[in-house]
Regions:
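PLP-dependent aminotransferase-like
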Residues: 1-40
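Short, structured coil segments at secondary-structure junctions
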Residues: 8-9, 93, 175
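Short glycine/serine/threonine/alanine-rich loop segments
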Residues: 10, 67, 177
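Short beta-strands and strand-loop turn motifs
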Residues: 14-15, 37-43, 69-73, 180
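Active-site pre-lysine segment of PLP-dependent enzymes
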Residues: 22-34, 46-69, 75-106
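PLP-dependent aminotransferase class I/II
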Residues: 96-173, 177-178
Length: 180
């Protein structure tokens, strides 16, 4: 998203992380009068860390109402932790939050470049003003729709990836490499 931000002339500012985790306090330190958007990938790629439900709610509460909080839920299917909730679950009817999802990860459709966003009508209307026509082709659309029907593939993929994550974590720990 950094490239798109620069195209439209936005200044991208990164906040410090603490132990590879996003910190609300560090984000808030970077907020200025000119801040328009705070963007969070939750869970984060590549660290795999995440912001808990309470942290995410706290961040939205502490941000100025005029600042849009964008939550990228690209990997939410892999989150089994009890203290995690997807952005969509937390902010379904909020005006100043926009949720992103992708078909690239769990559905394996990365090359089709298809996903979706959820937000208020005001945000959607603004996006339609800048959206190019024909930005997602019919084949990609049909693949996305069909992939939503295959619930067993999603379950199998989550299990496969989590099993491998445990194996990798165990191997790394055997070399005294700490993981999250």
């Amino acid at each position: 998203y950094r490239i798109y931000s620069k195209i439209v002339g936005a200044k991208v500012v990164f906040s410090k992380e603490r132990n590879f985790k996003v910190s609300n306090d560090e984000i808030l330190k970077k907020i200025t009068k000119r801040t328009k958007i705070v963007f969070i990938a939750n869970p984060n790629n590549p660290t795999g860390t995440y912001i808990s439900k309470n942290q995410l709610l706290d961040l939205r509460k502490r941000l100025n109402k005029k600042i849009l909080l964008v939550v990228d839920d690209a990997y939410f299917e892999y989150m089994l932790n009890e203290d995690y909730k997807s952005g969509l679950e937390l902010f379904k009817n909020k005006n100043n939050v926009f949720i992103l999802r992708t078909f690239s990860k769990i559905y394996g459709l990365a090359s089709l470049r298809v996903g979706w966003g959820y937000g208020s009508k005001k945000i959607i209307d603004a996006l339609y003003k800048i959206k190019p026509p024909f930005n997602v082709n019919k084949i990609a659309q049909q693949c996305a729709v069909e992939s939503l029907k295959d619930k067993s593939f999603v379950k199998k993929s989550v299990k496969h990836n989590l099993d491998w994550a445990k194996k990798i974590q165990k191997e790394m720990n055997s070399y005294n490499i700490q993981t999250n």
